[in-house]
Amino acid sequence: EMSASLVGSEMCIRDSCDIANGLGVRVTLFVSGCTNHCENCFQPQTWDFCYGKPFTSETEDELIRLLSPDYINGLTLLGGEPFEPKNQRALLPFLRRVRRELPQKTIWSFTGFTWEELHDPTAYSRCEVTDELLSLLDVLVDGRYVDALHDISLRFRGSSNQRIIDVPKTLQSGTLTLWDERANI
């Protein structure tokens, strides 16, 4: 298992394969650094932007290798917070590479920010690369984890306020479109 965080232009990450954070068998990239600090966060150690190890070209190559087998459905970004502005800037070149080299793989991301916050020009989470980063995703699970709304029956979410967004359909229609689990079984 690896770990990494974004430090300046570096990112520290942890990676592993799992089936709990998106459809199918996935490679999970844990991005360090988070200012949301949700109560009872399941990964509070990843709030630190320096947690884990630096994201290097060797790490990137290893993730591409891990993503390559046919039985791997795709990549999931977790945190920490992938949509911290400095994390967005560091993730963008890697996600471009995943799309270029492995176009058949899906990319999911979890964020404590809402879709609306990511599109609000005055919001902390929005930066010059947010739109392109979102355009590279298939699914975004948005919203802060709210302990009072925790529900173990929810698939791919920790609390009922979080939404599973079909990013391509949302961008194409201009209307927030939830991911249809039944259509993706």
Predicted regions and their residues:
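Conserved Radical SAM active-site core
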Residues: 25, 40-123, 128, 132-133
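Short, conserved loop/helix-junction motifs that constitute active-site signature segments
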Residues: 132-135, 158
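Single conserved hydrophobic/aromatic residue that forms the stacking wall/gate
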Residues: 1-13
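P-loop/Walker A phosphate-binding loop and immediately adjacent motor/lid segment at beta-alpha junctions
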Residues: 94-99, 150-185
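N-terminal pre-triad scaffold of radical SAM enzymes
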Residues: 14-37
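Short glycine-rich, flexible loops that bind phosphorylated cofactors or substrates
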Residues: 84, 148-149
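Receiver (REC) domain switch/active-site residues of two-component response regulators
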Residues: 138
